[in-house]
A protein has these predicted regions:
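Bacterial N-terminal signal peptides
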Residues: 14-25
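Amphipathic alpha-helical scaffolding segments comprising HEAT/armadillo-like alpha-solenoid repeats
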Residues: 32-40, 71-82, 103-115
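HEAT-repeat alpha-solenoid elements in large eukaryotic scaffold proteins
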Residues: 44-58
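Residue-level detector of extended alpha-helical repeat arrays and alpha-solenoid scaffolds
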Residues: 59-62, 91
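Core register positions within helices of long alpha-helical scaffolds
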Residues: 65-68, 97-100, 129-143
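Short coil turns that connect the paired helices of HEAT/ARM alpha-solenoid repeats
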Residues: 83-89, 113-127
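Short N-proximal segments of mature Sec-exported proteins
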Residues: 84-102
Length: 154
């Protein structure tokens, strides 16, 4: 026996369809927000650190955020957008990321970058110190941090 849909069935189907569309859009929005949060957090970095830091030798939050951004297909765009409002430590991370994923963008920024005399908080192993921004910038330009992102994360 064929049963034709009632008005109640059509209404329920319509509500489910609309709810599905809304939920799928929220999922896309939440994903985009979490992807952008890594770039935003990277730009806000208070200190600069690569490799194991602290007593436990853990990966720094900045390195973890940089790795998350660099893995994205739009990494260069995210890094360049984040650079505009980055702290000095954030700028260093972003330059390392651009050097890896978009050399042309890296060269463009490095060529026009103001080189302040300010110091940046740096963590190396268990030691926290302040180092000149210019010195760290020179190390980035010399490729001293290039291999860190090639290593597997732990």
């Amino acid at each position: 026996m064929n049963k034709s849909p009632t008005a109640c069935d059509v209404k329920r189907l319509t509500i489910m369809l609309v709810a599905g569309i809304v939920l799928s859009q929220l999922g896309v929005s939440a994903t985009a927000t979490s992807e952008n949060s890594a770039a935003r957090d990277l730009a806000a970095a208070k200190s600069f650190a690569f490799g194991g830091v602290g007593v436990a030798g853990l990966m720094s939050e900045g390195e973890r955020n940089l790795r998350a951004v660099v893995e994205r297909p739009d990494a260069s765009q995210q890094l360049q957008a984040a650079f505009a409002h980055a702290t000095l430590a954030g700028e260093l991370y972003i330059l390392i990321g651009l050097r890896r994923c978009d050399r042309a963008a890296y060269q463009k920024i490095i060529g026009s970058l103001a080189r302040p005399n300010d110091d940046v908080e740096v963590a190396r192993g268990c030691m926290i110190s302040r180092e000149p921004f210019r010195q760290l910038l020179s190390q980035i330009h010399d490729g001293r941090f290039d291999d860190y992102l090639s290593r597997p994360s732990w």
